[in-house]
């Protein structure tokens, strides 16, 4: 059991709260980073599977799906790992038991898990460098690849929109059930961020500019807006 004192400082974090959670046989420890206000929740238990996640509050302000595109884009190379797709390399070469990134209606989450200590720390390092030092602020091509771009296959064919997220959301919006669910959500929450499609509406995705893309990254992807577990 960890021997920690409430209100004491540990590596720049202030220890704020301790609670036993019998249902998951864990002791939870809550910390707050003194300089940035970042929250950290640590689960103390005997589970051999180690899990790490960093999340950011990302309430959408339109239907462009900027946070969904950012979720994809931060994993397209970073300062320390300048590969085209480090996420794909981790999927192929790490010992992870879970590796993903998810965009919700009001937050974006980057979770990893592994039973191997060295692999676990490497996964954390790659993800932390990805969210705090991504190449997307320098490479407009990342937005074009993951978000949207124009594509012309021949002079006889019309110009089309393409992009990883754009194509993904076209598939989502091809479902009548999804369209109905979106209409219900807009009706239920007309004056909140939940009225917007956080994943991106294919009609609105091409409205996202590179300048706004970078501004939203800088505004929301910072330690003071993060929650770490």
Where are these regions (language model features)?
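Short, conserved catalytic-motif segment at the N-terminal edge
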Residues: 48-52
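Active-site recognition of the HExxH zinc-binding catalytic motif
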Residues: 64-76
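Secondary-structure transition/turn motif
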Residues: 34-35, 46, 57-59, 115-116
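Short pre-active-site segment immediately N-terminal to the catalytic Zn-binding motif
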Residues: 55-65
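N- or domain-start disorder-to-order transition segments that initiate the globular core
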Residues: 2-47
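Charge-rich, well-structured scaffold segments of protease-associated domains
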Residues: 1-10, 59, 73-82, 86-229
């Amino acid at each position: 059991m960890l021997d920690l004192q409430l209100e004491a400082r540990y590596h720049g974090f202030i220890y704020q709260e301790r609670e036993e959670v019998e249902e998951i046989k864990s002791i939870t420890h809550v910390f707050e980073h003194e300089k940035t206000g970042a929250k950290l929740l640590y689960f103390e238990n005997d589970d051999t599977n180690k899990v790490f996640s960093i999340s950011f509050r990302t309430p959408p302000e339109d239907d462009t799906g900027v946070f969904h595109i950012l979720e994809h884009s931060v994993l397209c190379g970073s300062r320390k790992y300048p590969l085209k797709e480090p996420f794909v390399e981790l999927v192929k070469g790490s010992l992870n038991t879970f590796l993903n990134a998810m965009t919700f209606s009001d937050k974006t989450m980057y979770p990893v898990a592994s039973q191997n200590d060295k692999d676990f720390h490497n996964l954390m390092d790659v993800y932390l460098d990805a969210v705090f030092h991504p190449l997307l602020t320098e490479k407009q091509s990342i937005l074009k690849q993951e978000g949207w771009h124009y594509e012309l296959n021949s002079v006889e064919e019309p110009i089309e929109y393409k992009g990883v997220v754009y194509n993904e959301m076209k598939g989502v919006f091809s479902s009548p059930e999804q369209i109905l669910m979106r209409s219900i959500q807009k009706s239920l929450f007309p004056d909140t961020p939940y009225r917007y499609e956080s994943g991106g509406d294919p009609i609105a995705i091409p409205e996202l500019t590179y300048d706004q893309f970078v501004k939203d990254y800088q505004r929301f992807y910072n330690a003071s807006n993060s929650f770490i577990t």
